[in-house]
């Protein structure tokens, strides 16, 4: 697999459309950090790491009635074309209704947190 983050976002998108209660994927620290941001922002109900070889990352999805809380996910920086932004260039997603996720030297964080800390980095994805 050439892009594990895109694979993660696609699994979440497909599980949400199929109204599945949870989704599993191979574990990595980057994916776990991204999942914890989704949980903190209220897009995912629960994040857990299942032991074993190989480790699995399990996300419990949130729904409002019969509709997923996550309306859209979009990968920005890809392996073939990286997208870096400075602290002043961090975009707002849907006028603040969504979240941009950025990988900075201090770790993975939302665009709002990176702006407050005056950090730039690789723009991973948008979630709304």
Positions of predicted regions on the chain:
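Core subunits and conserved enzymes of cellular information-processing
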Residues: 1-128
């Amino acid at each position: 697999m050439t892009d594990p983050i895109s694979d993660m976002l696609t699994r979440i998108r497909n599980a949400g459309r199929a109204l599945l209660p949870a989704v599993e994927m191979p574990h990595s620290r980057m994916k776990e950090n991204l999942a914890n941001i989704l949980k903190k922002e209220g897009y995912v109900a629960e994040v857990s790491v299942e032991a074993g070889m190989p480790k699995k990352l399990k996300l419990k999805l949130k729904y409002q009635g019969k509709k997923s809380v996550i309306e859209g996910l979009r990968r920005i920086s890809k392996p073939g074309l990286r997208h870096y932004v400075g602290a002043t260039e961090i975009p707002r997603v849907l006028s603040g209704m969504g979240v941009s996720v950025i990988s900075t030297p201090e770790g993975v964080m939302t665009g709002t947190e990176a702006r407050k800390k005056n950090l730039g980095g690789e723009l991973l994805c948008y979630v709304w």
